[in-house]
């Protein structure tokens, strides 16, 4: 089970200077076995938000273009790209030299370096979502589609982790260590344990209340085997895209958001 530290902090105010390895050790010794601590932003080292200032045709390749990109360091960079949805003014994910990507989301990870593509110098790489591990969070609708970050109103040069709220710590917990503790199968349960460990206040979750009445009834055919059954009837549900913060949280803990 993966847990997001920023999500846990909704319920308990963990000090900013707390050592995450110490937290993992204390949880392991007291309650559950923490198998791994991951600083999520490390996946996006040397990746920033860039703004495409201009687009020129590639002199030696019909399917490639030369983008003039502002990455916030005061110098416009030439980056060769084959994306089909490139536009002037578009915010994009730029992998600078030193970043680790997967070409077209496949194969082994490779390190980005300054290079020449068909005779034109290219500073880095303008990325599709699956090339930087974000394919489930930002699914592409067509092949060779570049990740469009124009909805994120951040300056050129903002680190990708900061721009997308991915500067988080993930705790991976061994499910076998809490099989008999269903109260720990989520962020609030672990937050409660952390609050108890360090004598921190725990935020209260207010129960959901509604005045809506329903004709939905449940009859217990065998009360000895099923002494209690709780059902909820829901109506008026509209299927639509979830807010980005919710999608991001779901993605962080290893699930695919809708």
Language-model segment annotations:
Residues 1-208:
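Phosphate-backbone binding interfaces of nucleic-acid-interacting proteins
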Residues 4, 12, 25, 39, ...:
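Glycine/proline-enriched, intrinsically flexible loops and inter-domain linkers
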């Amino acid at each position: 089970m993966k847990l997001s530290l920023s999500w846990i902090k909704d319920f308990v105010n963990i000090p900013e200077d707390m050592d995450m390895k110490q937290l993992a050790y204390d949880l392991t010794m007291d309650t559950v076995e923490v198998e791994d601590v991951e600083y999520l932003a490390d996946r996006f080292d040397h990746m920033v938000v860039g703004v495409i200032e201009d687009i020129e045709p590639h002199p030696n390749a019909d399917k490639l273009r030369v983008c003039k990109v502002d990455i916030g360091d005061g110098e416009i960079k030439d980056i060769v790209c084959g994306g089909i949805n490139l536009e002037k003014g578009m915010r994009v994910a730029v992998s600078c030299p030193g970043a680790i990507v997967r070409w077209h989301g496949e194969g082994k990870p490779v390190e980005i370096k300054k290079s020449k593509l068909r005779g034109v110098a290219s500073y880095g790489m303008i990325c599709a979502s699956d090339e930087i591990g974000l394919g489930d969070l930002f699914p592409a609708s067509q092949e060779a589609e570049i990740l469009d970050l124009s909805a994120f109103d951040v300056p050129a040069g903002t680190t990708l982790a900061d721009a997308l709220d991915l500067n988080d710590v993930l705790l991976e917990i061994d499910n076998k260590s809490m099989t008999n503790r269903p109260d720990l199968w989520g962020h609030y349960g672990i937050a409660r344990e952390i609050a108890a460990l360090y004598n921190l206040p725990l935020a209260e979750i207010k129960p959901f209340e509604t005045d809506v009445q329903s004709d939905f009834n449940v009859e217990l055919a065998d009360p000895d085997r099923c002494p209690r059954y709780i059902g909820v009837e829901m109506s008026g549900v509209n299927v639509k895209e979830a807010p980005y913060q919710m999608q991001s949280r779901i993605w962080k803990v290893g699930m695919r958001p809708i």
